[in-house]
Amino acid sequence: MALDQVSIPPSYHGLAIQRIPLRTGLVPAEPMKTLVPSKSKLNTIEAKRIMSVLDEAIHKIELITLMSYMESHPEALEDTLPEDFVRALREHLDIGQTLVERASILQRRHKKLEEEEEAEETRNQERLLSLELHKVNLLTLAHQFRDSTKTVLRLVLGEPQFTRLLQVQAPGRSPGAQCLLDGLVELRGFLFEKLLTSPMEVREKNQFIQDISRRSERNQEVIDDLQAELANVLKNKESEVEKENFVIQELKNHLHQVFKFSENSLLRTKQEAEKQQKVDFRASQVRLAKTQQDILALRAQYHNLVMENREAEQALRKKKYKVETEIENWIQKYDMEMGEKQDEYEDLESIHKEEKLQLEELRERHAVLVEEFSQIRAESEINSKKRVEAEREMVRMVRAATLIQAVWKGYLVRSILRSKKKKRGKGKGKDKGKGKEKPKEEKAKEKKPKAKGKGKKK
């Protein structure tokens, strides 16, 4: 434990001064408006106090991380420091040096004890006791080192000029110290945003995050389904490709075999084709003469048909011209009607835009009225609760008063009855035993209840 407390890395690193921004601002994000607080400044005193305490802690840690430079280079700063500061710094350095030396001694002894585990038990116990004593002394030195660190820090805070000089002369901070400061600054920004956020915005943010998580889960499910489907499709495609490759290989083999046997068949077919060509040439000569005669006959028939169809063509052209003129008239009429409709549509669109603006204003008024209604409703609920509580308190007070009155009346009645019984007893005693005097103790006992009865009657 003591070794863990003493092993402190150097608090400065690098040659450039690392300035730490202690102010955070809200970054505007258009697509994430629900996650941005509506306020930009702290309004409550408690929040301002919290932020001031955190800023002061960050400033102190910033100075503490630069103290290692002051510890390693005390001669560079002695000329600019007062005497009490130099004295406190030297005491701090002496305590730190002794602490490091004792920690190294304790570490060496601990290693030696681990190496000599096979020695006698008594010697091991003695060494363990000595190690425990060294650890206790080391803890006291660690407490002294902590107190001296606080003293030096208090003196540094009391000298703002020395603080600025230390920040200028110190080369930088170690990665661990810089990481600690960055974490504190990040914590400050998070706390600042947390204090700016109202409970309503927290609920909206939680709802927004839940919606995004649900949407992400649904998208992930869809992605998983699509990936499974894609895997199945790829498997099917691979199987189909394998089948097609197998078929292609078989076709190649078959084609190779066909190519081997095709040469002989090609020669035979060539000879047969030459013979067939001669026969077909003769037959074609006969068919050619016959077709020429048919062509002459068809030409004469075609000429006759053309002459017959010219009259029908002229009639159809007249009909087509008439239909085209009617179509043009209809198109002009359609254009006029569409122009009127377009003007009417533009008028309606302008009216629609005006009504839409009015609707937006009404929605804003409705939102304001809803907020006012919720506030009034909350206030009425609080007032009704207070009124019910007051009525209950009044009922309890009335019951208590009636109970107290009943108890008091019963007590008065009992005291009156008791006094009457005593008077009756006195009358009977006087009649029976005249001349006999009671003892002094009995007389005193009788006088006491009489006095009590008189006080109650009053």
From Swiss-Prot:
S-S bonds: none
Q: Which residue windows are coiled coil?
A: 96-137, 209-255, 285-379
Subunit details for this protein? Component of the nexin-dynein regulatory complex (N-DRC). Interacts with CFAP52.
Q: What is this protein called?
A: Dynein regulatory complex protein 10
Pfam families assigned: IQ
PROSITE patterns registered for this protein in UniProt: IQ
Where does this protein have compositionally biased stretches of type Basic and acidic residues?
428-445
Which species is this record about?
Mus musculus
Principal localization reads cytoplasm
Quote the PANTHER family the UniProt record gives: DYNEIN REGULATORY COMPLEX PROTEIN 10, IQ DOMAIN-CONTAINING PROTEIN D
Extract the CDD domains matched here: IQCD (cd23767)
Q: Where is the composition biased (Basic residues)?
A: 446-458
The entry's localization annotation reads:
Cytoplasm, Cytoskeleton, Flagellum axoneme
Its family? Answer: Belongs to the DRC10 family.
Positions of the IQ domain: 397-426
Q: Where is this region: Disordered?
A: 419-458
Tell me, in a sentence or two, what this protein's role is. Answer: Component of the nexin-dynein regulatory complex (N-DRC), a key regulator of ciliary/flagellar motility which maintains the alignment and integrity of the distal axoneme and regulates microtubule sliding in motile axonemes.
- Entry keyword set: Cell projection, Cilium, Coiled coil, Cytoplasm, Cytoskeleton, Flagellum
Assigned GO CC terms: ciliary basal body; cytoplasm; motile cilium
